[in-house]
Amino acid sequence: MEVELKFLVEDQIARERILSDKHLAEIMDKGSLEEIDMSAVYFDTADLDLCNNEIAFRVRRENGQPIATLKWGGKVENGLHMRGELNVSVNEEYAKNPSLSIFKGSEIYEEIEKAACDKPLKPLLEANCVRKQMRVDTGKSISVVSLDLGEIVTSKGNAPISELEVELYSGDEDDMIALGRELATKYNLKEGAKSKFRVGLELLGYKKENKL
């Protein structure tokens, strides 16, 4: 299960200050600050069977290492995103010709098999960004704080990525939410109601409501 807060960071000065925030520096796990180059391609059938069943499938390279990910269901409320998530490290051969069969045996496989019905998959959109992230420990929760800058790319237009994510790793969910709200208030951030995938779908003209 993925549990994260998402905020839009529209001001460059705010982006710079978040990364050097005094409170984050105090609770950051030493050596956890890192920069990750991310390049994601989302796939679906020609009929968007996965989207229509509130399932997202992507292959994302993180500093060159491809990872296949499924996300499904969940809810979004006041910038808090909760959904099912499954990640599998894959090789380059798989990344060039991805298949849902790699998730066979998982809790979601029967559902995705029923949704896609062995139809071929095609690239739908891309989300490319540079992520700067750190792991923080408040004593009550451990979270990953990430700042993403980049672009969503579709055949019908592009959109910028400039967002802050605070994702719960372990511990108390309310404590993680309090940390995220503290940062949002301090830097005047807007709640992010839409995932990168959802923004891309809307660029493509996809109208059906879902929580992806």
Language-model segments: which ranges?
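Phosphate-end processing signature that detects enzymes handling 5′-triphosphorylated RNA
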Residues: 1-212
